[in-house]
Amino acid sequence: MSNTSQKHRDFVSEPMGDKPITALAGIGEVLGGKLEEQGFDKAYVLLGQFLILRKDADDLFKDWLKDSCGANSRQADLCSSCLKEWCSSFL
């Protein structure tokens, strides 16, 4: 039995394309709205930030997510894990 959400599994199961920011696990309407206000309107835009900040230290991305849109630790973990798994499959 998997411990990831259906939202996570759906996101990592296919190429990202033009998916909205809210398609990412851990990002709902409220956080998505805050990120959109900062120009992060699509999942691929947030992926860019993830790749810039990550480089084998995803705590930087999680901290940035908490600071930039008020994500809590669980939301930041879910989003980071989702992007990390997507990268493993598609990059």
Curated annotation (Swiss-Prot):
Membrane-crossing residue ranges in chain numbering: none
One GO cellular component term: nucleus
Localisation: Nucleus
Example GO biological process: chromosome organization
A Pfam family recorded for this sequence: SAM_BAF
Predominant location: nucleus
Keywords in alphabetical order: Nucleus
Keyword Nucleus appears in the UniProt entry: yes
Gene3D superfamilies: Barrier-to-autointegration factor, BAF
Gene Ontology molecular-function annotations: DNA binding
Assembly mode: Homodimer.
PANTHER family registered for this protein in UniProt: BARRIER TO AUTOINTEGRATION FACTOR 2, BARRIER-TO-AUTOINTEGRATION FACTOR-LIKE PROTEIN
Official protein name in the record: Barrier-to-autointegration factor-like protein
Species, as recorded: Xenopus laevis
Lineage: Eukaryota, Metazoa, Chordata, Craniata, Vertebrata
